Every structure is written in C-alpha cells, then in structure tokens.
Regions:
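Glycine- and aromatic-enriched membrane insertion/assembly motifs of diderm outer-membrane
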Residues: 42, 49-110
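Outer-membrane beta-barrel channels and translocator barrels
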Residues: 28, 81-83, 138-142, 183-187, ...
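Residues that define the transmembrane beta-barrel architecture of outer-membrane proteins
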Residues: 29-31, 66-70, 123-129, 143, ...
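Transmembrane beta-strands of outer-membrane beta-barrel pores
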Residues: 39-43, 92-96, 135-137, 151-157, ...
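Outer-membrane beta-barrel translocator domains and adjoining extracellular loop/strand segments
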Residues: 45-52, 99-105, 157-165, 202-209
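Predominantly the C-terminal beta-signal and adjacent terminal strand-loop region
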Residues: 185-238
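Short glycine/proline- and aromatic-enriched beta-strand/turn motifs that initiate or cap beta-hairpins
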Residues: 14-68, 230, 236-238
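Transmembrane beta-strands of outer-membrane beta-barrel proteins
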Residues: 31-37, 86-90, 127-129, 145-151, ...
C-alpha cells in the first residue's frame, strides 16, 4: 500500500511536468552508477516437527510480527539492449526478527511463564550482493515502469553465538521486483519493491555448544527447517 501511494504521487508529479522530457539521453549510457536507501522487512519461514522433550513438552516456533529495518546500496547498471539492463547493487541491510517459542503441551496449572513461552530477538546485519536483470517498458513521457529478477548473495555479520536457534551466516536468495523510473530534471528516481526468497535451510542443527544444556537444545530439536524471506522497498537515485 505504501509503495503504491508513493509511486502514484511521484508519477503524478512527473506527469505534471511531462511537457518537457527530462534527461532524454540517460538511458543511452552503456554504464551508469547510483545509490539507494530504503527499508526492509525480514522474515523467516519455520518448519516445526512436533519434537517432544523427556518432560513431555512440545514446543513450536513462529514469527508473529515484523518490524522495519534500514538498507543502503550502491549501484552499477550495464545497458544490454533497449529494454534490458544488468544491475549489481551491493549494500547492507539492517533489521531484526523476533521468534516466539510456544509450549503447546503446557497444562493450565503451569504458572511459570518460561515454561509456556519464550522469545528470541535475532538481529541481523546483512552484506548483500544482488545481481538483477531489469526488463523495462518503453518510456512514456517522464516515467518508465519495469520488472526485475535475479539472485542475491547474503552474509550476516552480526550473529550472537548463544542463540536458541542458530542460523547460518550465508544464504542465497531468488529475487523478483517491480518499480518505475521517474525522470526528474537532475537525476532519475526509481522506487522499487522487491521480494526475496531464501534457497537453503539456514538452521544449524549441529549444536555441540548445547549438548549439556537440554533446556536450550529443545528449541533446535523442535525445528526441521528455516528459510529466509525479505520484502525490500528502495529508492534509487541514478
């Protein structure tokens, strides 16, 4: 919704000034550079297995809510053809995910809150290496919509080594997105919405550090698979 409102407002502004074609030769450059700032919503998809502890407890994990993070990238754009560009935009994504652990087998008489539910705040600082193919429509006055698709390498450099669930530092993601080039007098503004889907199971099942701590190990034992997902809203300045 936010992306649609911002895009409509910027497009309307560009159309109000469409009698003059801004930056007419911007798309003719073989290579150009830029940067972006934006926000991201990080999520993980958790597959629970119904593991039961020696005490008869069954825990499951979920991410019930999401909070926005911040992202910044630099951009190198290579023109392949009239409507095709290859874009490399390394950067950093900052965000967090709160995982809730619920004891679904806790009887009503259990009053200790830690026997009913716990939580884990997973803070992430991602170094990202996205490579995207940009497929653009023909320019209409001062706007030009486009779609993107690509892959993105992800490396988390802010891991807490004592987490209940420990996630791998590296991941690979498929990305699809949409946006619009808006040609302003001095630069091109490109709001873009991108969806990122993790390709690997990032859960680290081998936890020798928790062999003597079954109270912590039960959370890892209760989960079979964890995959990363993200929604990213960025504003490119080119």
């Amino acid at each position: 919704m936010l992306f649609a409102l911002v895009l409509c407002a910027l497009t309307a502004f560009a159309q109000d000034n469409d009698k003059i074609l801004n930056r007419q030769y911007a798309d003719q450059k073989k290579i150009h550079f830029g940067f972006s700032v934006g926000t991201n919503f990080q999520d993980i998809h958790i597959v629970n297995n119904g593991f039961q502890t020696e005490d008869g407890e069954t825990w499951y994990a979920d991410v019930p809510q999401h909070s926005p993070g911040f992202c910044v990238n630099v951009l190198a754009d290579l023109r392949l053809a009239k409507n095709f560009n290859l874009r490399f935009s390394p950067g950093m994504y900052f965000g967090n995910k709160v995982v809730k652990y619920i004891n679904s087998s806790a009887p009503d008489e259990v009053t200790d809150p830690l026997r009913r539910n716990q939580s884990q705040n997973i803070k992430s600082t991602y170094i990202v290496l996205p490579l995207d193919l940009k497929i653009s429509a023909n320019r209409y006055h001062n706007v030009r919509p486009y779609f993107t698709g690509g892959v993105m390498g992800v490396f988390d450099v802010a891991k807490d080594r004592t987490e209940q669930l420990r996630l791998a530092n590296g991941d690979a993601m498929l990305t699809v997105g949409m946006g619009c080039d808006i040609y302003l007098p001095f630069f091109k503004l490109c709001p873009e919405l991108k969806f990122c889907f993790g390709l690997k199971n990032v859960l680290q099942k081998n936890r020798p550090d928790l062999e003597d701590n079954p109270e912590m190990m039960r959370f890892t034992q209760s989960v079979d698979k964890v995959t990363n997902n993200m929604v990213v809203l960025t504003f490119y300045f080119e």
